[in-house]
Amino acid sequence: MNIAAASRDLPALFRPKQRLGFNTRVSFNDDDGPAQGLRQGIELFRQAERLGYQSGWAYQRHFDHYLSSPLPFFAAVGQHTRHITLGSAVIPMRYQDPILLAEAAGTTDLLIDGRLELAISTGANGAFDAVFGTVDTDARTEAKRRQSRFLAAIAGDVLHIVTERDTGAPAGAELRVTPHSPTLRSRIRQGSASLDSAIQAAELGIGLISGTVLHDQAEGETFGQYQARIIDAYRTHWLRIWKTTPPPVAVAASVLVGTTPELREKYAAYDLERRTAGIAASRPKGALAPAGQPVGALISPVFQGTPDAVIEAVLSDPGLAAADELVLFLPPAFGLSENIRLLADLATTVAPSLGWKPASDNQGPEQAAIQGSRPPA
């Protein structure tokens, strides 16, 4: 792989990108079926690692043509890769059993040598209550309750001391989640779409990843301006609460580098579709279209064009400038070869000008994972 040398100085407020990642939905269509989609998803992670990407993320979505259960998928990917970190972006906590999720996460992390990074969210979407069951509070409050329980479980906290008779454990036994991965909690992030959720992440002492949809912005505020404000609030609150250096922040964005006229035309068409259809853009055949876009939501721009045009656009965007890690959001309907081309073109023509260096072949998982001064577990 030929990586172009950076040929320009970075703007003063632009943070060099410590890591380069990608976010895929591991989608499938009605023609090829889910098995092929899953196998191609594994191959995508293999190729990304070959290109020097430090992280790969998969989106979770229930009842659709996308990955519904990321952890067994990551366990499989881990057997085909060596050092790229594997992350969920994101797992909504509203419909998760926190103890079962902690058990599955610990098992997966140990199987893949400590490369798991889980981004979780506490969004207020209760769209599937009819399937998963209703609760006696609102969706966001319930999601936060489950998030708290999950974080305690993966930290190795005692969840219960047995006092009951005729149970599966002796009286006085302290019940903790096993198998326990001691460092996993330090690799949990909050998927943040608002200022409040970023502040909550800082209060909980977990990392932050910002995605392609934001809400609760100020009037007249652009996506990049609001994203930068969210990141700044996270770092400010982290420093105030923990008195340590905040962990690196990741930002997912559509950065589509057109290295040929045909690719530029294709990416411009996707840009137009995203600006007109919003979150419903780029759906694989048979996938469900959202009933509507969240009221007041901001959709991230698509950074597309020639390599030089993309570099200039990324360098001037406040949100991307504030991030430590750039995560390429892959259009959901794109196929394996199209996605590999996107990964390769970003890594070879644009990312070096953002201060990024590819992972080396001998890089271990502890080096590939996010580094920061975390609070005590």
Residue ranges and their predicted role:
Residues 24-39, 91-99, 183-192, 256, ...:
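Active-site mouth loops of central-metabolism enzymes
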Residues 55-77, 92, 212-224, 327-338:
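Glycine-rich, proline-tolerant flexible connector loops at the mouths of alpha/beta enzymes
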Residues 68-91, 146, 346-358:
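Alpha-helix-loop-beta-strand connector modules within alpha/beta enzyme cores
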Residues 2-16, 138-177, 219-323, 357-376:
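An alpha-helical appendage that flanks or caps ligand/catalytic pockets
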Residues 13-36, 95-162, 208, 216, ...:
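Flexible, glycine-rich active-site loops centered on histidine and acidic residues
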Residues 1-84, 368-369, 375:
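N-terminal beta1-alpha1-beta2 module of alpha/beta enzyme domains
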Residues 20-24, 56-58, 86-89, 116-120, ...:
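Hydrophobic faces of well-ordered beta-strands that scaffold small-molecule active sites
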Residues 52, 60, 77, 108, ...:
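Conserved, mostly hydrophobic/aromatic
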